[in-house]
């Protein structure tokens, strides 16, 4: 989509970060609407957009941006065998749209995701999701979500 520089290590500019914030929100929710700043906090962190830069309440995405996001979500769902029979909308509402708490620690951020009964399915996910490391953010994000219980 052209948001990143040629080395894929930084966003091209502030406008690209803002577009990425709204694209991430669309990716999670599957819809475009007006958002409060507080609903975009995690996306702001993931794009390294400084807090002093205001965000619009709404940003219209291009057809290409929406199609890319929809294909990405469908691809993730298709590569998780336990999601067979689950609609894309059901997948989004069950696993992507969650409440969470974000805390800044000395060396990283901690994202604690609200637990749901069906989170046991996370034990079957064929990729890692406990750490988010991006070249443009200084501190990685540690994800605390469905800690497997060992008895």
Give the residues covered by each predicted segment:
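Short, compositionally biased pre-sequence/patch detector
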Residues: 1-151
């Amino acid at each position: 989509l052209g948001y990143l520089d040629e080395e894929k290590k930084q966003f091209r500019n502030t406008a690209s970060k803002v577009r990425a914030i709204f694209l991430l929100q669309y990716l999670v929710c599957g819809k475009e609407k007006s958002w409060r700043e507080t609903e975009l906090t995690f996306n702001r962190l993931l794009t390294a957009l400084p807090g002093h830069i205001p965000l619009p309440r709404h940003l219209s995405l291009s057809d290409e941006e929406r199609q890319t996001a929809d294909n990405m979500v469908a691809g993730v769902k298709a590569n998780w065998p336990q999601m067979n029979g689950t609609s894309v909308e059901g997948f989004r509402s069950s696993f992507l749209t969650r409440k969470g708490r974000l805390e800044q620690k000395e060396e990283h951020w901690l994202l604690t995701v609200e637990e749901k009964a069906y989170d046991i399915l996370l034990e079957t996910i064929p990729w890692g999701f406990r750490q988010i490391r991006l070249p443009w953010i200084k501190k990685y994000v540690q994800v605390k979500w469905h800690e497997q219980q060992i008895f």
